[in-house]
Amino acid sequence: RRTPFDDINVRKAVSLLFPYDFINKILFHNLLSRTHGPWDNSNLQATEQPNPTSFSIISKYKDQISLEALKIININKPLNNRALVKKALNLLNESGWKLENNKMVSKKNKKKLTFSVITNQARMEKLLLVWAQQLEKIGVDLRVRVTDSSQFQYRLQSFDFDSIVFKYHMSLSPGNEQYIYWGNWAASQSGSRNYAGINHPAIDESINVIVNSKNRDKLIEATQTLDILLRAGK
């Protein structure tokens, strides 16, 4: 919602360095399976070839959608750590950041790139600190804040955070709740679950089609479209 995450390149750069493989191996003995979208491992997840509904909506809003919306993120080949660091640095450089004296700073005002992540789960602190160590390699300062449940809930409802740890539970028959998660009206509605502040006409139209679908096939196509757009991030 706020600087520096109002820039998609910054969001991508820091997420690239989330050490999923390391955490899965060391802390979870490779028992986890990484997800890439809200409806993974179901017929609602985005497909490699856009369906008719996807093509229609993406074409209509093509000037407002990132080219990433035309790709399926989880079919990209995984990169090694060095390649991930290089890609993250390139993304930050494109958005006006540079590494100077081991700190990522703005080219414009020399302000350091720093952000906090809040959670109410003490067990998450260990995972987030591993992420902080990874980000330190490119000069980004991540600060982990563990709060009690009441403070965490207050921060969520008032959108008072840089980033959070939150888990969405998705239905295989999505409906009106998608407005609350990703809809335009919910972006500024205190207490909604649109924590990221998503406000995009293509996403609103996808949700409209989901809610008004007359058959399962149309609902599947619209949900796959929403999945593509959420993964694209812009």
Task: Report residues per predicted region.
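Extracytoplasmic/periplasmic ligand-capture domains
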Residues: 1-233
